[in-house]
């Protein structure tokens, strides 16, 4: 394997774009904190971090295999390894299988409930790319897939999926719909031409209002989570910071339109980090005060 092929595999796995990994990782780590009622065991952190990174790459490969014919018509994607012929579909399938086995080996260190849930996670990862052909809001399926680690984190630690896990899961789904709608704006004109469905297409001229709506639905659910878990005021301070971020972004969208959508999408990982930090500090305060 030469240097050019290695680079092509690297690009296929999207390792040059770590932001989506962080968008999945922060909610998963936050779920580990919530499930542990504090800092989780280091083994869980290692297993879930590896799992997130590997399954993100698996999702990217599946997406590129499914979209190889569509990607040829989109300026942003027509140079991807499969579309440009740098790698074959066969190469991609073997890499996908290998990485899936790595992820499954990681999950074998967890309980049976979590192992069973991992098959649901894989199903969602496979389903998402094909939803763009028939489902008006494929971002909903992406939200289900991206944030399924929340359920797996709770099942690994508590061997159950309690109410707070569901609240947090739905909150992150709303957040995912919002930020991936921003991302989809970059391809909206191409999607309209080739018949690909997305929330950016569905919401039309009111897309920025819907982005703000889903952002604030996620914040409302975080407030409900805080009330349910009896969190202190510090948690709500973090929610306020997130709301200011969303309002700021809304006016940036209105001003700059789709020219800033990729940067706006990338900035969302800070929201995940803020929620993770306030969850950690929340339990530290509970522990020592």
From Swiss-Prot:
GO biological process: ubiquinone biosynthetic process
First-listed, main subcellular location of the protein, grouped into a coarse class: membrane
Keyword line: Cell inner membrane, Cell membrane, Magnesium, Membrane, Transferase, Transmembrane, Transmembrane helix, Ubiquinone biosynthesis
Compartments reported by the entry: Cell inner membrane
Swiss-Prot/TrEMBL cofactor(s): Mg(2+)
Molecular functions per Gene Ontology: 4-hydroxybenzoate polyprenyltransferase activity
Catalysed reactions, as listed in the record: all-trans-octaprenyl diphosphate + 4-hydroxybenzoate = 4-hydroxy-3-(all-trans-octaprenyl)benzoate + diphosphate
HAMAP family the record matches: UbiA
Protein function: Catalyzes the prenylation of para-hydroxybenzoate (PHB) with an all-trans polyprenyl group. Mediates the second step in the final reaction sequence of ubiquinone-8 (UQ-8) biosynthesis, which is the condensation of the polyisoprenoid side chain with PHB, generating the first membrane-bound Q intermediate 3-octaprenyl-4-hydroxybenzoate.
Protein name (database record): 4-hydroxybenzoate octaprenyltransferase
Organism expressing this protein natively: Francisella tularensis subsp. tularensis (strain WY96-3418)
Name of the encoding gene: ubiA
């Amino acid at each position: 394997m030469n240097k050019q092929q290695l680079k092509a595999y690297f690009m296929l796995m999207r390792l040059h774009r770590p932001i989506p990994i962080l968008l999945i990782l922060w909610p998963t780590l936050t779920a580990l904190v919530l499930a542990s009622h504090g800092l989780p065991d280091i083994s869980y952190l290692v297993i879930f971090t590896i799992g997130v990174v590997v399954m993100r790459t698996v999702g990217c490969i599946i997406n590129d295999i499914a979209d190889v014919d569509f990607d040829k018509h989109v300026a942003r994607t027509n140079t991807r390894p499969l579309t440009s012929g740098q790698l074959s579909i066969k190469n991609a399938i073997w890499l996908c299988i290998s990485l899936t086995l790595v992820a499954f080996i990681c999950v074998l260190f967890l309980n049976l409930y979590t192992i069973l849930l991992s098959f649901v996670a894989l199903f969602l990862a496979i389903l998402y790319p094909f939803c763009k052909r028939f489902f008006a809001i494929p971002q909903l399926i992406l939200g289900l897939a991206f944030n399924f680690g929340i359920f797996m984190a709770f099942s690994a630690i508590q061997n159950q999926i309690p109410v707070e896990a569901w609240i947090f899961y739905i909150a992150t789904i709303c957040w995912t719909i919002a930020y991936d709608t921003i991302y989809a704006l970059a391809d909206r004109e191409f999607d309209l031409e080739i018949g690909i469905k997305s929330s950016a297409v569905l919401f039309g001229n009111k897309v920025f209002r819907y982005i703000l709506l889903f952002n604030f639905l996620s914040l409302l659910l975080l407030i409900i989570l805080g009330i349910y878990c009896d969190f202190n005021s510090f948690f709500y301070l973090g929610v306020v910071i997130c709301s200011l971020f969303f309002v700021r972004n809304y006016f940036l969208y209105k001003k700059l339109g789709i020219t800033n959508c990729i940067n706006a999408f990338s900035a969302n990982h800070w929201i995940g980090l803020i929620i993770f930090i306030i969850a950690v500090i929340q339990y530290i305060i509970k522990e020592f005060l």
